[in-house]
Amino acid sequence: MWENFIEEKVKEIRETVGDGKAIIALSGGVDSSTAAVLAHRAIGDRLHAVFVNTGFMRKGEPEFVVKTFRDEFGLNLHYVDASERFFRELKGVTDPEEKRKIIGRVFIEVFEEVAKEINADFLIQGTIAPDWIESHGKIKSHHNVGGLPERLNLKLIEPLRDLYKDEVRELAKELGLPEKIYNRMPFPGPGLAVRVLGEVTPERVAIVREANAIVEEEIEKAGLKPWQAFAVLLGVKTVGVQGDIRAYKETVAVRVVESLDGMTANAMNVPWEVLQRIAFRITSEIPEVGRVLYDITNKPPATIEFE
């Protein structure tokens, strides 16, 4: 099945782009990664993949994306480290909605600057079926590059728009993408910035990045397959004991949920010893953290992410 689909899409992209150039915002998530590899098969180096490091990525993510797509797949990859710019723009901002808006705006500004330099004719997006079906036929813009086609006068190509998430995962596997990509858990567009409650600073993101990595490692080691598993820095300090003295440290919440589509979700019944190991590692490996909590709330009433 996938051989025909790949052949058809490669032909379609090749014919549409012609001698022109195309650009894609590559996040390292399964949708954009699959669309990028598919388009690269069609037009080679005339596809410019842009990876923007916002500073809110998972541990080792920028290095992994560069190694996978530039070194292994041979993509024409533009790596942009805009982390300082993002942190500067978010200084003093604590409102979750405001944070999301700023991150979206800065991302578009950065992507737009690169797109102008490249002078591309087409924008390739990893839009999938639920993105536009959920919004009743009106295409829901990708949170990062919404509005860009019109602003930059780019023609839009969406090779995955008729596929569902499980199909995209199958296609990614068929295209030779590593399991770390095709089986990865969903990750919020604004990244770790929405897993830091309150102001987003490099120091606070560093704490949640480490905690997040520990949660993912231990859940994987235990052989569990949740929809999502992550850590959140609550921005609440509590009293603890360090040796003979009282210590005043940060609190981290751990969230592990099961879901079919992310629309509803149940808190996972994670074995007690796994939770204890996570708590032990977070408090012993991250000196700033003194307390770990487990969130047992379903969706609804809570959302999966905290912000």
UniProtKB/Swiss-Prot annotation:
This enzyme's EC code(s): 6.3.5.2
Function in brief: Catalyzes the synthesis of GMP from XMP.
Annotated InterPro entries: GMP_synth_C, GMP_synthase_B, GMPS_ATP_PPase_dom, NAD/GMP_synthase, Rossmann-like_a/b/a_fold
Protein name: GMP synthase [glutamine-hydrolyzing] subunit B
Assembly information from the UniProt record: Heterodimer composed of a glutamine amidotransferase subunit (A) and a GMP-binding subunit (B).
Reactions that this protein is recorded to catalyse: XMP + L-glutamine + ATP + H2O = GMP + L-glutamate + AMP + diphosphate + 2 H(+)
GO CC terms of this entry: cytosol
Organism classification: Archaea, Methanobacteriati, Methanobacteriota, Thermococci, Thermococcales
Lineage: superkingdom: Archaea
NCBIfam families for the chain: guaA_Cterm, PRK00074.1
The entry's keywords: ATP-binding, GMP biosynthesis, Ligase, Nucleotide-binding, Purine biosynthesis
Keyword Lipoprotein: no
Top EC class for this record: ligase
GO molecular function: ATP binding; GMP synthase activity
Pathway: Purine metabolism; GMP biosynthesis; GMP from XMP (L-Gln route): step 1/1
Gene3D superfamilies linked: 3.30.300.10, HUPs
Organism of provenance: Thermococcus kodakarensis (strain ATCC BAA-918 / JCM 12380 / KOD1) (Pyrococcus kodakaraensis (strain KOD1))
Biological process, per Gene Ontology: GMP biosynthetic process
Binding site for ATP: 27-33
Domain named GMPS ATP-PPase: residues: 1-184
CDD domains: GMP_synthase_C
